Amino acid sequence: MAYPVQLGFQDAASPIMEELLYFHDHTLMIMFLISSLVLYIISLMLTTELMHTNTMDAQEVETVWTILPAAILILIALPSLRILYMMDEITTPSLTLKTMGHQWYWSYEYTDYEDLCFDSYMTPSSDLKPGELRLLEVDNRVVLPTELAVRMLISSEDVLHSWTVPSLGVKTDAIPGRLNQATLMASRPGVYYGQCSEICGANHSFMPIVLELVPLKHFEEWLLSML
């Protein structure tokens, strides 16, 4: 989860988020090299006293500055497209969770089981227990198994919302009348926090998301207690 004065990403807890972190580092390194080259050329232009008054064209330079940017864009685009398809691809999900956004709470439905649905509201600050996080705790947490592919079906009943859990690399818009799909698979147990990431009204800041990822055995025990 996030911590005060954090400048980087949250720790990755899913294969998708790990890929996103690798892609971020890959792109950042390319940007660093380009920026260094530009600064080097600018410093040369400011310090050199050499002048070429008879230069009319430079075919070699024009060829290089056309091909090189194209190659750099390809180096960025290929891993980006790979991750994009990974995020959308889900063939055999072990579980399906339907999420509906409301003003200003979330409702969840485990579609593989009958009558397993609940609403999730933010816990007021006055009701927080010691150790709980202000504006991030909810009255009903979403419990899911680890190391299993979960298909998220996300929509809204009123306005635009966005269901986001940074540690898992999930951010999907909840659009009224449209059912969006996302893939979720946690690589380790834990409690993961998120929030609505689309301005949706006066209480937009009070729509937290809490996922409790547990081993399959504990998930089955939780299911039995809920059914």
Swiss-Prot record:
Mg(2+) binds at residue 198. Gene3D superfamilies: 1.10.287.90, Cupredoxins - blue copper proteins. Its EC number is 7.1.1.9. It is found in: Mitochondrion inner membrane. Cu cation A2 binds at residues 196, 198, 200, 204. It catalyses: 4 Fe(II)-[cytochrome c] + O2 + 8 H(+)(in) = 4 Fe(III)-[cytochrome c] + 2 H2O + 4 H(+)(out). Its main location: mitochondrion. It is a multi-pass membrane protein. Residues 1-14, 88-227 are mitochondrial intermembrane. Keywords: Copper, Electron transport, Magnesium, Membrane, Metal-binding, Mitochondrion, Mitochondrion inner membrane, Respiratory chain, Translocase, Transmembrane, Transmembrane helix, Transport. GO terms for cellular component: mitochondrial inner membrane; respiratory chain complex IV. Residues 46-59 are mitochondrial matrix. Pfam families: COX2, COX2_TM. Cu cation A1 binds at residues 161, 196, 200, 207. Its cofactor is Cu cation. One of its GO terms (molecular function) is cytochrome-c oxidase activity. The chain crosses the membrane at residues 15-45, 60-87. It comes from the Eukaryota. Belongs to the cytochrome c oxidase subunit 2 family. Component of the cytochrome c oxidase (complex IV, CIV), a multisubunit enzyme composed of 14 subunits. The complex is composed of a catalytic core of 3 subunits MT-CO1, MT-CO2 and MT-CO3, encoded in the mitochondrial DNA, and 11 supernumerary subunits COX4I, COX5A, COX5B, COX6A, COX6B, COX6C, COX7A, COX7B, COX7C, COX8 and NDUFA4, which are encoded in the nuclear genome. Component of the cytochrome c oxidase, the last enzyme in the mitochondrial electron transport chain which drives oxidative phosphorylation. The respiratory chain contains 3 multisubunit complexes succinate dehydrogenase (complex II, CII), ubiquinol-cytochrome c oxidoreductase (cytochrome b-c1 complex, complex III, CIII) and cytochrome c oxidase (complex IV, CIV), that cooperate to transfer electrons derived from NADH and succinate to molecular oxygen, creating an electrochemical gradient over the inner membrane that drives transmembrane transport and the ATP synthase. This is Cytochrome c oxidase subunit 2. It comes from Lemur catta. The gene is MT-CO2.
